[in-house]
Amino acid sequence: MPTSDPGLRRVTVHAGAQAVDLTLPAAVPVATLIPSIVDILGDRGASPATAARYQLSALGAPALPNATTLAQCGIRDGAVLVLHKSSAQPPTPRCDDVAEAVAAALDTTARPQCQRTTRLSGALAASCITAGGGLMLVRNALGTNVTRYSDATAGVVAAAGLAALLFAVIACRTYRDPIAGLTLSVIATIFGAVAGLLAVPGVPGVHSVLVAAMAAAATSVLAMRITGCGGITLTAVACCAVVVAAATLVGAITAAPVPAIGSLATLASFGLLEVSARMAVLLAGLSPRLPPALNPDDADALPTTDRLTTRANRADAWLTSLLAAFAASATIGAIGTAVATHGIHRSSMGGIALAAVTGALLLLRARSADTRRSLVFAICGITTVATAFTVAADRALEHGPWIAALTAMLAAVAMFLGFVAPALSLSPVTYRTIELLECLALIAMVPLTAWLCGAYSAVRHLDLTWT
């Protein structure tokens, strides 16, 4: 071997109180050399046989980078190196530029902007603006002072609904965007309902609501068919509109007052909620059927797994739509009853009680549903209870302390149900008690409905003659 080989380095490595002379390759990374050096020192008893992280450094210099070679670090023949264990904790980093360090820290903690969140925000904003504009048009139609351009207003609203429906088709069929398609379909349904309400001449009444509900049902079904997206939501809207249309049709035929129509619609909605599971099974084709002559040896006569899976998914979608529709129709009926009875001394308490019981029943049903369905029940129940509380507070404006105390109590109950109750482990007796309370509240809907329909007054004024 020549006296001076440029590919080798003759160095002395110190480790604690021991030292060893080694010839190391100059083109091998330091991280590859360290295990061999540790093994040599370990054989000589200079290092304990414990796992640790080692570093190699020159005298009075920082540790050599593990990815570099001895030649790159400037190590020559005769150099003295020190093998030592690395510290358990890395040194605290120091910042030369405070502004750059602050920006880097914020970049690591800030969440990236989610495109889905932006799209949902835009969809929610568009829906709320459309609903707000529709409510203002309905308010103007109910007022006796605003009577001009009613036909033109209905035409513009109908044209806007058709345009929204056209853009919904483009969004779903061309761009494959279900969020935009569903939002535009809902907007078209709102415009269709408002156009139907304004199409009836005169001040809106039961007949106007009937036309509006049928227009909303037709628009939602049409949007669902031509767009192919948002089937669950649009089905729920259509079913809810059909229930409202049926209730208003009864009111138009019998000339019943609004509290009676609303209370009967609410009671019917709870009845439909009880049979919604059976309806979903029937509509999905999962109802048990007796085949005419089933041969056990004929495998083709039995349903396949794929077909059963498709029907099961269809039944789940139908159940979600029906539950949402009937919960919404119960909410609309209860709110309409509470608002219609406001100012009527005899029936005001009945409307408030009906809305409060309806909200409680919907909130109780939210505990036994999954995430999607419980959210619908919770929103409907909270809206109904809030309406009942608002009407009751407006009826008793002179009792300010009681209103403040009731507000604080309801807020505390809401916080308890949202944050504390989910973490509690309830006993079977408690579950049975809650179910019993739900049954009692459902039974109480019948006498409340009879009260609001005027059944008790009619019986009281009967002139029965016993012979």
Curated annotation (Swiss-Prot):
Cystine bridges: none
Membrane topology note: Multi-pass membrane protein
Residue stretches spanning the membrane: 122-142, 152-172, 186-206, 209-229, 241-261, 264-284, 319-339, 344-364, 374-394, 401-421, 439-459
Pfam families per UniProt: EccD (PF19053), YukD (PF08817)
Keywords: Cell membrane, Membrane, Transmembrane, Transmembrane helix
Family statement: Belongs to the EccD/Snm4 family.
NCBIfam families the UniProt entry points to: T7SS_EccD
Subunit organization: Part of the ESX-4 / type VII secretion system (T7SS), which is composed of cytosolic and membrane components.
Misc remark: Was identified as a high-confidence drug target.
Protein's name according to its UniProt entry: ESX-4 secretion system protein eccD4
Source organism (scientific name): Mycobacterium tuberculosis (strain ATCC 25618 / H37Rv)
